[in-house]
Amino acid sequence: MKIWKDIFTGDEMFSDTYKVKLIDNVMYEVYGKHVSRTLGDVQLDGANPSAEEADEGTDAATESGVDIVLNHRLVETGFADKKQFTTYLKDYMKKLVTRLEENNPSEVEVFKTNINKVMKDLLGRFKDLQFFTGESMDCEGLIAMLEYRDIDGESTPILLCFKHGLEEEKF
């Protein structure tokens, strides 16, 4: 199993339990689905219900959302406007280039060449995107983007993450 973590915060962003596609060698698209889960009662194996106190019974709580977001405890965040998002992208890209120059100089040109196209595309779709940080909620790290696309007549959630802002860990 592979898990991709934010290189700046160490937060888990997604794993290979989902369909993962690399776009222009700079952006991962992670295909999720909308799920609802019941967060029910805890059952203790071996407990004798007749010897226990009467259970008052509670309504089982449910949570629903995108499986990637729920499973990796991503936290929704936002940008006030496109200008604020653009500022974040420029600052984050500078951090990535600096890190690439230190750790992986052969990737710098590919990154710089392809990232401009991807950034223009993201800015054009700004109003259709949701934004998520990792569990630590550190906005200095990677902010993943989520959009919905119509695939085979179904609205499919797709998480977008910058490849160079992640490290792959195998378990």
UniProtKB/Swiss-Prot annotation:
Keyword field: Calcium, Cytoplasm
Gene assigned in the entry: Tctp
Record domain TCTP: where: 1-171
Function of the protein: Involved in calcium binding and microtubule stabilization.
Family label: Belongs to the TCTP family.
PROSITE patterns: TCTP_1, TCTP_2, TCTP_3
An MF annotation (GO) of this entry: calcium ion binding
Record-linked InterPro entries: Mss4-like_sf (IPR011057), Mss4/transl-control_tumour (IPR011323), TCTP (IPR034737), Translation_control_tumour_CS (IPR018103), Translational_control_tumour_p (IPR018105)
Gene3D superfamilies: Metal Binding Protein, Guanine Nucleotide Exchange Factor, Chain A
GO cellular component, one term: cytoplasm
Subcellular location: Cytoplasm
Protein name: Translationally-controlled tumor protein homolog
A matching Pfam family: TCTP
